[in-house]
Amino acid sequence: GILDAGVNVIRINFSHNNEKEHLERIAQVRKYEKENDTFIGVLMDLQGPKIRISSFIDNKVLLSRGDQFTLDSELPKSEGTQTAVGIAYKQLPNDLSAGNTLLLDDGKIILKVLQIDGPKILTEVLQGGTLSNNKGINLRGGGLSASALTEKDKQDIHTAAKADADYVAISFPIHADDIRETKRLLMEAGSNASVIAKIERAEALQEDVINEIIQESAGIMVARGDLGVEIGDPQLPAQQKRLILLARANDRFVITATQMLESMITSPIPTRA
């Protein structure tokens, strides 16, 4: 499989599966290491805050440009309709104001905030399409208040320690304190894992913030999916180059992720792009 093909780091995504399955996979990697006298790094990727819509009665709806659509933090979880859907992150109305732009499902759906009415976010659809259950929500330009480390992440850090992970990646850090907290929790759990900061929030790009994040981390990941949605795709290539240069200048490794060689999912050779 991929181990024989020469992979040198395995990423375990805490957004999926459970502790038992994660530990079983890692045991397979460690067994392969011993049998082949090699080293394969184990990177365990924390899920981070889930800022998502809830689900629809019919699992999906088709939104058209100009439609009025409401995100309602008090709507029951599975009762979304053509005109409204619940949200898992109950603080979202407090983070927004009229004129904000929300991007759903990695930017496929674009909503303009018209008004905040208590628990309801009233919006107009600027870019429509099919919206299905549990899709992510981003705020153009950043500014959502969700903490980078959730209670689930803190539990998963103990799993990473149990698995003797080599690296732990923290999702959506806003400042260096998020990295320091992750390192502290790892140390308390008995882990020597190095911490990787996934750069995917607009706030993390500020000069003083990104420099301190890089200093506190063993390496960074340019998470082009969420970052591109927050800052806009036209800004992404320049920021990607900037982050790579900053990491190298500080003697930190850097991973560039999301849609890298994606064509090779279905093709044995990459495109020229």
Residue ranges, per PLM feature:
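Non-catalytic helical/linker scaffolds that mediate oligomerization, partner binding
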Residues: 1-273
